[in-house]
Amino acid sequence: LVPLTDDDRPLPPPDSPAAREFARRNPGSWLHEIDPFFGSGEDVPPYGIVGAWRIDEAGEITGRFRKNPGYRPSPRVLGFPEPADALDAAVQLVVAGYGADDQAVALLLSSEVLVATQPEGADDSLWVHEIDGIEGIFVFTSQERLPSEPLLEGGSWRTATGSELASSAPDGVDIVVNINGPARWKVPAQRLRAAARP
């Protein structure tokens, strides 16, 4: 098996001086390909290993590649945009399987977000809406994550705190974060409420 680029060309094996030196010192073994999320010298969990290149008995890296079935692509590899703030970063990590859900929930509770609102003249309560079969209260982590148009003609956005979401969102409803982006995250209102309790 040889990994492919986005346009289906074979990906060449690593050819850096460090990779060649590792291969020279470790003939007959494997050279791990690591997700770029992890820096040099960091401890890498199993899910951060893309796979491994075979090193032959002469200490040369071959074109043979063994894929790691447990690999999880990081936000960068998935093409997520650069996080606009700490909550955005936490959401991206959770969606990619790199972050703890509980930490993102706690951060949402302590953050101010933008909430989709109904047309002018409607009450200012949290609005439960449906888009593409997904129902919930739609919130956005920052101005950078807002859609170009309101979710409903005449609608807009307003700021809300995570604690307001926890206290006002009805049971059985999801808080849907950044629905228009690649890192979409859903949190049940009951879970947010439970996390807000002292």
Language-model segments: residues:
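An interfacial alpha-helical scaffold signature
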Residues: 1-198
